[in-house]
């Protein structure tokens, strides 16, 4: 749909802005990041001791949680990335109440300006609410009403990329991501 292309152009033309791609540790989004307790993090370090240093380089501590941008860890250890998926907040890994608390708390704490986010605020959260929590449109709208109440006083813009030909866009994406 052009999200990454647009992000690359914005990054090139606005170098003073901090760019957050999907998989980065973002102040508003946790897609492709693990969200672990300290105990879980220590267990992962023990299980994957050969890459524990890399884990540390891609991990931040927020309150009582360790957030790891695990897809940024390059390794040939079979199954590592799949193993780390279980610690994401998406894909139904946590109950909706906790999911909502984590996301809305991130929105509340977010006060920075000068950022550009890829796939944030809607894509991953809506997908999770539809596919994993099987929420109705009204329930999803209720979530976003709460989100809007939190975000309405903050200084940012939300861009929507309208796809004119959905079928050919899906075909292009399939070809690009064949692996």
Predicted features and spans:
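Walker A/P-loop nucleotide-binding motif
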Residues: 1
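Walker A/P-loop
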Residues: 4
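Short, well-ordered coil/turn elements that cap or connect secondary structure elements
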Residues: 12-14, 111, 153
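Conserved phosphate-donor/acceptor-positioning beta-strand/loop module used by diverse small-molecule
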Residues: 118-120, 137-179
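Hydrophobic anchor at the start of a short beta-strand
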Residues: 16-18, 115, 156-158
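Conserved substrate/cofactor phosphate-moiety recognition/catalytic segment
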Residues: 11-65, 126-132
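Glycine-rich phosphate-binding loop used to anchor ATP phosphates in small-molecule kinases
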Residues: 52-151
């Amino acid at each position: 749909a052009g999200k990454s292309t647009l992000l690359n152009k914005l990054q090139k033309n606005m170098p003073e802005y901090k760019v957050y791609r999907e998989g980065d540790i973002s102040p508003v989004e946790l897609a492709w990041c693990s969200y672990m307790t300290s105990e879980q993090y220590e267990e992962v370090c023990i299980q994957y001791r050969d890459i524990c240093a890399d884990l540390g380089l891609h991990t931040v501590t927020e309150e009582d949680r360790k957030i790891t941008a695990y897809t940024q860890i390059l390794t040939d250890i079979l199954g590592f990335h799949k193993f780390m998926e279980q610690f994401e907040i998406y894909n139904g890994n946590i109950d909706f109440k906790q999911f909502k608390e984590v996301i809305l708390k991130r929105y509340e704490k977010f006060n920075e300006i000068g950022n550009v986010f890829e796939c944030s605020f809607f894509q991953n959260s809506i997908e999770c609410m539809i596919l994993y929590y099987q929420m109705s449109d009204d329930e999803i709208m209720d979530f976003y009403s709460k989100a809007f109440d939190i975000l309405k006083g903050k200084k940012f813009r939300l861009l929507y990329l309208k796809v004119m030909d959905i079928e050919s866009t899906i075909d292009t994406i399939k070809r690009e991501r064949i692996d």
